[in-house]
Amino acid sequence: TIQKNAMSLVLELRKVEQFYLKLSDDERRVFFYKIRSQFNEERRKINYSVYDYSWVIQSSQFIFLNRTCFNGLYRVNSAGEFNVPFGSYKNPKIFDQENIERASELLEDTIIICGDFSTCLDYTDDKTFLYFDPPYRPISGTSSFTSYTKEDFDDDEQIRLANLCREVSEKG
C-alpha cells in the first residue's frame, strides 16, 4: 500500500489517529481490540494479487496495531492471527507522514516478494542487499518462541538459513 497509494494510507491513518487520541484509556483498549479483531478477520478476505482499497484499510490497521500494541511487537498465534495485547501509551504517534512518503518513493521501483527465504537468490544480483531477521533460538527450556508466523522456525530452518547465508557469501 505504501508503494501503490501512500496518500490514501496517510489520510486513513490521520483519521484513525485523531479518533484514537480523543478516547479515554478504557475506550482506547476497546478500540484496539476491535481493530485487532477486524484486522484478523479481513486478512482472510483480501486478494493480494489485485490491488484495491481494502489494502489501504488493512495496512492502516496493521500500522495502528503496531504503534499501539505492547512494545510494538508483531506476533501471531497458530491460526495466523495477530495476537499481541494492547499497550498502554499516553500519546502514541500512530503514523509519520514524511516517513510514509519517503518509503513510497524508495519502493517505487521495488519488487516485493512473499515466500520462502530460499527463493531469494533467484532475484539477486551484485547490487542486492539481503537482510534476514529470523526468530532467535530459545536459550532455555522455558523459552519457546520460535516464530513470527504460524509455522515454526526450528533448528532445521536455522540450518537452511545458515546454508543460504554461506551460499550468498560465496556468491559475493
Specify the residue positions occupied by each region the protein language model found.
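Short, well-structured alpha-helical interface segments that form or flank functional binding sites
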Residues: 58, 112-115, 160
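SAM-dependent methyltransferase catalytic-core segment centered on the flexible catalytic loop
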Residues: 137-171
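Conserved proline-anchored active-site loop of SAM-dependent methyltransferases
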Residues: 1, 63, 67-70, 115-117, ...
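Adenosine-cofactor binding site in Rossmann-like domains, unifying the SAM/SAH pocket
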Residues: 106-117, 153
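Short, glycine/charged-enriched secondary-structure capping and boundary segments
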Residues: 78, 127-128, 144-147
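Amphipathic, non-transmembrane alpha-helical secondary structure
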Residues: 118-122, 159-162
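A structural motif corresponding to the C-terminal end of an alpha-helix
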Residues: 96-111, 162-172
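Class I S-adenosyl-L-methionine-dependent methyltransferase module
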Residues: 1-108
